[in-house]
């Protein structure tokens, strides 16, 4: 059995299918891990979600900020933003099945056999693996609890508070947890977030650094797969941290990682997020991914 992890899809179905065909993905035997941001901005959000739903028995997903935004706009359509490509999902006859499936996905996945964690954006540097899983479960519970669901989605938007505190409660607590797992790029060593900076690692403001680069990070004994940060172009200097968002929806590429061999494959994308030429490039373990 092979386990493949793929970076942000954002409604770009063609490159995903090219990658899976290239590695001869067999849903009866293999497993597909997805780092979140399954939908939005790309040309085929509805088709992508339907395709993933058809593979759900072979699939492990964690939620990204765009997936949570989808759930929020499904409740309140006025939250739709310019550039969102979610309306087709909201008007689809099978929307309840698709949205219900999204709602049941995790914020963090951990494979104990491989000692590999998967998240969308990152793990707060001050959290141990055990604490990270616990805090992810708090949000997962809110997503699946009818009494908490609406209040969580209504209150999840926002950049404050910028730092974790064990005494945080209610929606404020859930918002901070969500921001770490789905929006974080730069932070201080004790986890104070900068949610405005979105460019490459060299653009950090003084006192801040990429979440994965802090020497005091408490998950250094765990391999971590993440997406979200397209400006990294799939590059990360940390030996056990694997960045998979290579900017497919922006005309970059979509990246697939064999979780066991660490071999990468990349499919070139055009400016619309479609497979540019059907070309898939194999990148050896330890090699620098394509820009």
Swiss-Prot record:
EC number: 3.6.1.41
GO molecular function, one term: bis(5'-nucleosyl)-tetraphosphatase (symmetrical) activity
CDD domains linked: MPP_ApaH
Reactions the enzyme catalyzes: P(1),P(4)-bis(5'-adenosyl) tetraphosphate + H2O = 2 ADP + 2 H(+)
Keyword set, alphabetical order: Hydrolase
Enzyme class, first EC level, given as a word: hydrolase
Lineage: Bacteria, Pseudomonadati, Pseudomonadota, Gammaproteobacteria, Pseudomonadales
Family: Belongs to the Ap4A hydrolase family.
Function (record text): Hydrolyzes diadenosine 5',5'''-P1,P4-tetraphosphate to yield ADP.
Protein name: Bis(5'-nucleosyl)-tetraphosphatase, symmetrical
Matches recorded under NCBIfam families: apaH (TIGR00668), PRK00166.1 (NF001204)
């Amino acid at each position: 059995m092979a386990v493949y992890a793929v970076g942000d899809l954002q409604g770009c179905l063609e490159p995903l299918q090219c990658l899976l065909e290239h590695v001869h993905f067999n849903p009866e035997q293999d497993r597909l891990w997805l780092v979140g941001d399954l939908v939005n901005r790309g040309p085929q959000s509805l088709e992508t979600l339907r395709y993933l739903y058809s593979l759900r028995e072979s699939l492990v997903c964690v939620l990204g900020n765009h997936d949570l935004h989808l759930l929020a706009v499904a409740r309140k359509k006025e939250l739709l933003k310019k550039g969102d490509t979610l309306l087709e999902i909201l008007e689809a006859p099978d929307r309840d099945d698709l949205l219900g499936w999204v709602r049941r996905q995790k914020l963090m996945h951990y494979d104990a056999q491989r000692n590999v964690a998967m998240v969308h954006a990152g793990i707060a540097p001050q959290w141990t693996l055990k604490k990270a899983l616990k805090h992810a479960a708090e949000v997962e519970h809110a997503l699946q609890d009818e009494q908490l669901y609406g209040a969580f989605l209504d209150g999840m938007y926002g950049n404050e508070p910028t730092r974790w505190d064990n005494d945080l409660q209610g929606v404020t607590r859930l918002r901070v947890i969500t921001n770490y797992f789905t929006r974080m790029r730069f932070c201080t060593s004790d986890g104070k977030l900068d949610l405005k900076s979105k460019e490459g690692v060299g653009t950090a403001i003084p006192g801040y650094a990429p979440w994965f680069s802090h020497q005091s990070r408490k998950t250094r004994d765990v391999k971590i797969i993440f997406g979200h940060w397209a400006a990294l172009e799939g590059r990360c200097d940390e030996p056990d941290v694997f960045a998979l968002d290579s900017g497919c929806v922006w005309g970059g590429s979509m990246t697939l990682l064999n979780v066991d061999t660490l071999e990468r494959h990349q499919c070139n994308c055009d400016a619309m997020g479609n497979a540019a030429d059907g070309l898939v490039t194999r990148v050896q373990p330890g090699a620098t991914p394509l820009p």
